Amino acid sequence: MELHEIAHARAKAWIEEMVALCAPDTVYVCDGSKKEYDTIMQKMVDAGLATPLKKRKNCFLFRSQPSDVARVEARTFIASKREDDAGPTNHWTDPAELKKTMTGLYSQCMKGRTMYVIPFSMGPVGSPISKNGIEITDSEYVVCNMHIMTRVGTRVLEALGTDGEFVPCLHSVGKPLGPGVTDAGQWPCADMERKYISHFPEERLVWSFGSGYGGNALLGKKCFALRIASVLARDEGWLAEHMLILKITNPAGKTKYIGAAFPSACGKTNLAMMIPTLPGWKVETVGDDIAWMKFGKDGRLYAINPEAGFFGVAPGTSDFSNKNAMDSIKENAIFTNCGLTEDGDVWWEGIGYPAKGTIIDWHGVSRPAPTRDKSPKGEEIAHPNARFTAPARQCPAIASNWEDPEGVPIDAFLFGGRRPSTVPLVHQARDWNHGVFLGSIIGSEVTAAVISDQVGQIRRDPFAMLPFCGYHMADYFSHWIKLGSQARAENLPKIFCVNWFRKDAEGNFLWPGYGDNSRVLAWIFDRCDGVDNAVETAIGWMPKEGALNTEGLNVSTQAVKELLSVDIAGWKKEIKDIRENHYPKFGARLPQQLRDALEVLEARINGSEGAACTRDMC
C-alpha cells in the first residue's frame, strides 16, 4: 500500500506531517506479510546488523551499543499538562517545552533512511478490548520485532476505516545517514543525553527518539500498552496492567484464569509457562507480560493479552527454569545481545549447559567459552538484559483461546515480590479493598548483591506498575478501588499475595518454586470456589494445616510451618516502613481506604482485634 492510498484522513495527515519533519529518503507502509518481514530482515543481514543463526530456523542475532541495552527510566517522561497529574513516581516535563526540544531532534533525523509506517493492533484485530496504533520508525529492527509482538499491517488499516481511533507513535533511532553511508554493522542510536521516551497522556501520543532497544522503541509495548493505556483505562473504566494471564485446569477438568503482577526478576514468565509438578493439573499461557481487562455483560472482568509475542529476558532461561519458553524460541525468533557459539547458535548465562570452543560475546568480541553456564559479574557473554522475541503461537503451552476477542474471565489476581522474610508463601485478601492495599505495598528486598547501602530496605513497586503507570499512582489506586465499588463482590476476582522467595536463617530458599508453585495455585483455585481450606489471620486468609498439597515435596514440616506463619515482628517493621517511607510519597491523593487498611493491619497485628489464631499465625 502507498501512503496516498490510506483512507483514514487524520492518520494520513499525521504521517505526511511527520514525513515533512523527519525527511526520510523513502516512505514504506507495512502490510504485515511474511515476504515483507523476510525482505526487511535480509536488508539488516546485508547491512551487518543481523546474524543468521545456523542452528535455528529463521532466527537472527543482533548486538546493540552498550549505551542502548535496556529501558532508560531517567530519560522516560510523562508530559501531562499538569505536573501534579504525573505524580511522584514519574519524570514530568512541560509538554510544550518537550515538544519543542524533540521537534528539533526530529528535524531531518531520517535522512538517508526509510520511514516505515506500521499500522498495529494491540489485541486481536476487531476485539472490543483491543486498541489500534500507528508507529512511524526508521528502524528495520523495530519493524521486524513489531511483526512478532503485535498484529501488523493492512488488516489494521482496514479495521481503522476512515475515522477510527488510533494512538500515534513516532520513533527514530536519531542517526541520519549521509549519501552512500550505511550503518556498517553498527547498531544505530543516539547518545544518552539525546534519548527521549516521551508520553503525552491527554493527546494519547508517544514520541521516542535516540534508542533502538525494545521497550524504548517497540512503542506498542510499555509505552502504549501500559503508560498510555493506563490513562485510557482510567478514563474509560477498565484496567491496563503489567500482568501475566494463565489458564489453570484441575484434575476434574474445571478451568480458571489468573492474572499475576510481579516486579522484575520475580518469575512472571516462568509462572505463565509453568509445567505443574502436581499430577493432573495443567497450566496454559494466555499472556506473559500485559493484561487489558474490561467488565463483560455478566459483570465479570475479561482479559486479553494485547501482545502477539514474547519479549523475554534470555539469561536464566533454561529447560529447567522454563522449558516452554525454550521450545518457543527454536525458530522464527529474534535474539538481542546474546552470545554466539562457534557452531552458530545463541548462548547465555543460565542456559543450562556450557558452550564449546570459542564464543563471541554481546560486544562482538571472540573469547574462550565458559566451562560452566556462568560468568564472573561484569564479564558476561550475554548482557544480563539480553532478550528473545518470539511469536506467542509457538509456545507449546499457549491456550487454544488465547486470542479470544471477548477475552477470558479472571478468577484471581496474584501480587508478589522477592521477599526473603516477613511475607508468607501465600495469603488471601479479606475483600477487594484489602487486595488493593496488598497490591499497593508489594516490592522486593534489596540484597547485598545489589546496592550495599540499601541492604534490607524494601524497594516498593506497587502493582508492579511503578515504571509503567502513566498518571499519578495514588489516582491509580483510587481507580482500582472505584472499579471494585461498581461491581458485585461475587463477580470480582479474589486477590492473593504470594512470595516464592522466603529464606531460612542460613539464606537458603525455603520453597523450591518453579513447577511446585502449582501447589499454591491449586490452593488458590479451591479458594476461588469457596472451599473451606483457609484460616483467618492478622494479615488475611492463609492455608489451614494440611490444606497445601506437599505430597512428594522435599520440604521439611518446619519449613512449611515457617512459610505459612505470620512474622509479628516483621510485620510491625513492615507497617512502620509503609507509614513512614512508602505512603507519604503519594500525599493527600492517597485513598483513605488504603490508610484505613494500614490501620486495620496494625490493629490486627497488635492483637486489638480478635483474629482467629492457629499454628503460631497471629
From Swiss-Prot:
GO molecular function list: GTP binding; manganese ion binding; phosphoenolpyruvate carboxykinase (GTP) activity
The name this protein goes by in its record: Phosphoenolpyruvate carboxykinase [GTP]
UniProt: Mn(2+) binding residues: 222, 242, 289
Membership in a protein family: Belongs to the phosphoenolpyruvate carboxykinase [GTP] family.
Function according to Swiss-Prot or TrEMBL: Catalyzes the conversion of oxaloacetate (OAA) to phosphoenolpyruvate (PEP).
Pathway: Carbohydrate biosynthesis; gluconeogenesis
Gene name of this polypeptide: pckG
Entry keywords, A to Z: Cytoplasm, Decarboxylase, Gluconeogenesis, GTP-binding, Lyase, Manganese, Metal-binding, Nucleotide-binding
Signal peptide bounds: none
Enzyme Commission number(s): 4.1.1.32
CDD domains reported in the protein's UniProt record: PEPCK_GTP
